[in-house]
A protein has these predicted regions:
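Glycine-/small-residue-enriched transmembrane alpha-helix faces in small-molecule transporters
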Residues: 1-43, 94, 145-155, 163-193, ...
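Specific alpha-helical transmembrane segments that line the substrate/conduction pathway
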Residues: 39, 46, 93-141, 264-286
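Helix-helix packing/entry segments at the starts of transmembrane helices
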Residues: 16-17, 43, 103-110, 194-211, ...
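Transmembrane alpha-helices of multi-pass small-molecule transport proteins
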Residues: 35-87, 114-119, 149, 179-187, ...
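Loop-to-transmembrane alpha-helix entry segments
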Residues: 105-108, 124-156, 170-171, 261, ...
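C-terminal-most transmembrane helix of multi-pass membrane proteins
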Residues: 45, 266, 270-315
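Hydrophobic/small/kink-forming positions within alpha-helical transmembrane segments
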Residues: 21, 25, 82-86, 90, ...
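Specific transmembrane alpha-helical segments of multi-pass solute transporters/efflux pumps
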Residues: 19, 60-108, 156, 243-261
């Protein structure tokens, strides 16, 4: 039984990585088409709210508990939802204006490093003397060598791009992606203590709802600056929201829930997300005609993927 569950979880994890990778490719497609990056960043989440609401209705998950949980810690929900979603996605689409999608996907793996380093900011439930307590998480020291490997892999891919984009573009993109890589795990980790009673889909819906006013204001700014988005931008951002924001999220949560009883198997399923980079490269080659600038980038990708897999397996 466990073997069949693991096989199912493995396939779901791989599919989730594929749907997650679509984000990086479509962002590059929109950039090439001249779509304004602020529209690209806001429309995904404007689409996601009704899509997630529809999903909750299909799955018959109640909505009232979501509002009760948000109301009980409104300030925290607004703050960390905006950091985790707005602070994550806007810098990512901004960087996609200057760098190819596969490279954005590669640099984005820095979020694994910052996810581990921000562990002490999270409190996890533990039983102490027969009573439940929230205990501050610790940085798993066994992961540190593999975090260095990931950083080296990212560095090689970035160095390989030097000379193909202007230095200031590379620098500002790297800074933006670094900020996004910190904001995403930090926002999500700080929300977790307030979302203990919610399912994964309910939590994503709640965070999207709390960040929605910000995305609406940003879309108004985009409208005033460049006018309404094109039909192509609307369609592409819809597919990004559907693919990455809904389908991939649901698949990944389902995959992890199947093996949640075994931390070793859970780590192996989480390691499938290293395939985001692989799928981004393959899709870039097939649909965008992307090529590597030099062998440093190939080496960097190999090191990066190896590091991502090992940091999960060694937890």
């Amino acid at each position: 039984m466990y073997k069949s569950q693991f096989t199912q979880a493995l396939l779901l994890g791989i599919l989730a990585a594929l749907f997650f990778s679509v984000t990086f490719i479509l962002n590059q497609v929109m950039n090439v088409a001249g779509s304004y990056w602020l529209w690209n960043g806001t429309l995904r989440y404007l689409w996601m709210l009704p899509l997630l609401l529809l999903l909750l209705m299909i799955q018959r998950q109640p909505i009232k508990p979501i509002y009760r949980v948000i109301k009980s810690n409104l300030g925290a929900w607004i703050l960390w939802s905006n950091l985790g979603f707005v602070g994550f996605y806007l810098p990512l689409v901004f960087a996609a204006d200057y760098l190819p999608g596969w490279l954005v996907s590669s640099i984005w793996q820095l979020t694994i490093i910052f996810g581990v380093l921000t562990s002490p900011l999270t409190k996890i439930p533990q039983m102490i003397d027969g009573k439940p307590h929230l205990v501050r998480a610790k940085i798993p020291l066994v992961s540190l060598p593999w975090l260095v490997i990931i950083a080296i892999g990212v560095a090689f891919t970035v160095v390989g791009e030097h000379g193909h984009v202007r230095p200031w573009e590379l620098t500002i993109s790297l800074l933006a992606l670094t900020f996004a890589a910190i904001a995403y795990p930090l926002g999500n980790r700080k929300i977790m203590p307030h979302a203990q009673t919610l399912t994964g889909v309910q939590r994503v819906f709640a965070m999207t709802l709390c960040a929605y006013p910000t995305f609406l204001m940003l879309s108004l700014i985009a409208l005033l600056q460049v006018g309404p988005p094109s039909a192509e931008t609307l369609l592409n951002t819809f597919f990004v929201g559907l693919s990455s924001g809904v389908i991939a999220t649901v698949l990944f949560y389902k995959a992890t829930s199947l093996v949640a009883h075994d931390m070793r198997l859970l780590a192996q399923i989480e390691a499938t997300q290293a395939l985001e980079v692989v799928f981004s490269v393959i899709l870039s080659f097939i649909f965008l005609g992307t090529t590597f600038s030099n062998s440093w980038q190939i080496l960097g990708l190999i090191i990066l993927i190896f590091g991502v897999i090992m940091v999960n397996l060694r937890r």
